[in-house]
Amino acid sequence: MICVDHLCYHYKGGRPILRDVSFELETGHFLAVLGNNGVGKSTLLKCMNRILTADSGHCRIDGEDLLTLSHREIAKRVAFVAQHVPDTQMTVHDMVMLGRRPYMTWGVTEHDHHVVHEAMRYLNLEDMRGRFLNRLSGGERQKVMLARALAQEPTLLLLDEPTSNLDIRNQYQVLQITRDLCCEQGLTAMIVIHDLNLALRFCDRFLLLREGAVYRYGGAEIFDADALRDVYGVTGSIVDVQGHRLVLIDDEEKETRS
């Protein structure tokens, strides 16, 4: 169980970014963090991972408060995948092995090699282990970063717009892999994503932020005309969720249907 309680954050000398954010997420779910630009979506993930230090509040995994742990201990519980993938000459294998750093005390162990091998096998990267990241496509590099995150053996996976620079085929692939990790391995995942249709297709929980606060939280039933108007400024009378696709019906079309 992931439990975020009254999380607040503001930049020095600036306006509050997160305003008393609270929600609970059960193990094995895939949560989409949604909202307009500047409402605190990425900031929320970074506070949960202690990349940023929250002003107040708590973030607990199975009762353990992440905000009181060292960065090394957090990295054993939480993996973070950013939007931008390093363009480096590091090999695929070496990049995935970086996910084992929080556990290393006296060098690389046989267990480390086993975990890395399994992560690469799960992401179908075994044949690419010796290739350099700067020779890979954007979709391939993002799969490598997912493998590195998986090598951390985390409880919680945080993804900050990992699909924003990918074509639609690679977006689907990355999101499908993440959903499979939740379903098959009991991982819990949160993703910052802008495409509502993609979110509805792959995620099963949704957190709508507005002005840094929780506007709505739950399943697909949270989406209606009021939600899209208040959060995104989209106007219309009805919002239907049809086959994981949002359909907005304006007033004129509604009259035609009736």
Give residue spans per PLM region.
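Conserved ABC ATPase "signature" region
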Residues: 110-128, 153
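Conserved ABC transporter NBD signature motif
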Residues: 57-65, 74
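ABC ATPase nucleotide-binding domains
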Residues: 231-258
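The feature captures the beta-strand-to-loop junction immediately N-terminal to the Walker
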Residues: 34-36
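Catalytic Walker B motif of ABC-type/P-loop ATPase nucleotide-binding domains
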Residues: 157-161
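Conserved ABC ATPase signature
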Residues: 132-136, 140
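Helix-to-loop junction immediately C-terminal to a conserved catalytic motif
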Residues: 49
